[in-house]
């Protein structure tokens, strides 16, 4: 599994736990997010830690909900 896939997989788990979502809803939230798309395309700030990416994603998902 490449790094991008590992990052996205970890973010799905974090979204699932943070928002108490079922796995498919968490996957959908990450897949539909702007950050998730940027990560998938490698167009994100690579200096950010996984925790920082998760915090940004939490904000984005919370706003979308």
Annotate the PLM regions.
Residues 1-65:
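C-terminal alpha-helical interaction appendages
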């Amino acid at each position: 599994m490449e790094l991008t896939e590992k990052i996205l997989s970890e973010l799905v788990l974090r979204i699932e736990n943070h928002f108490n979502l079922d796995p498919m809803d968490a996957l959908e939230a990450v897949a539909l997010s702007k950050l998730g798309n940027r990560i998938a395309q490698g167009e994100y700030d690579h200096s950010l830690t996984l925790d920082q990416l998760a915090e940004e994603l939490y904000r984005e998902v919370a706003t979308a909900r």
